[in-house]
């Protein structure tokens, strides 16, 4: 399977990085191909809704690092949305990447991709992840894609917290068993 990870975290060794490392380790054991796009370290211009792209009929006016991501997204079987919780939503870096889906909308919408959400945050409350989950779910409804799993690491200020609470193991198992979940 081809898996694209869209990582919105600006922390190379943070909690989300740990969860993604474990997820990737699981996918490698299962023999899958992974393309990781670390949005915080890429040049991604925000979409300005100029509509020159025609949702995929023409090239986007911004020729930035998204140009390399688009073909990977198109061939992906699974897309992983990963972000630490910032004000109960995804990071601006990840949201900018998702907004730029517009440039190839006609090729993504209705393509039947499977998706996963990986998020971490310090708030341990059940409600803490509702905002990011709702945003994710609405994007999937629009794109007509299907959620196949989530790792929601609540109450994790550090990667050690995520390790101790078993979220790394959960991410690993999700990666290892992704093909079964994607059926």
What are these regions, as identified by a protein language model?
Residues 38-41, 153-157:
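Short beta->alpha junction loops
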Residues 106:
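Conserved adenylate-forming
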Residues 1-82, 88-103, 165-183:
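N-terminal beta1-alpha1-beta2 submodule of the flavodoxin-like/Rossmannoid cofactor-binding fold
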Residues 92-93, 109-150:
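Short, glycine-/small-residue-rich phosphate/pyrophosphate-handling segment
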């Amino acid at each position: 399977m081809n898996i694209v990870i869209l990582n919105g975290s600006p922390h190379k060794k943070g909690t989300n990085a740990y969860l993604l490392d474990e997820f990737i380790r699981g996918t490698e054991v299962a023999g899958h191909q992974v393309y990781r796009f670390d949005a915080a370290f890429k040049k991604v211009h925000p979409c300005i809704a100029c509509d020159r792209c025609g949702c995929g009929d023409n090239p986007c006016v911004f020729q930035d690092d998204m140009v390399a991501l688009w073909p990977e997204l198109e061939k992906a079987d699974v897309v992983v949305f990963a972000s630490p919780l910032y004000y109960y939503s995804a990071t601006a870096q990840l949201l900018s990447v998702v907004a730029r889906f517009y440039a190839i909308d006609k090729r993504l919408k209705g393509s039947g991709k499977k998706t996963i959400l990986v998020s971490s945050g310090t708030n341990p409350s059940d409600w803490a992840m509702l905002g990011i989950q709702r945003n994710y779910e609405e994007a999937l409804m629009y794109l007509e894609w299907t959620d196949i799993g989530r790792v929601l690491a609540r109450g994790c200020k550090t990667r050690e917290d995520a390790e101790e609470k078993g979220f790394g193991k959960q991410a690993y198992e999700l990666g290892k068993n992704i093909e079964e979940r994607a059926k």
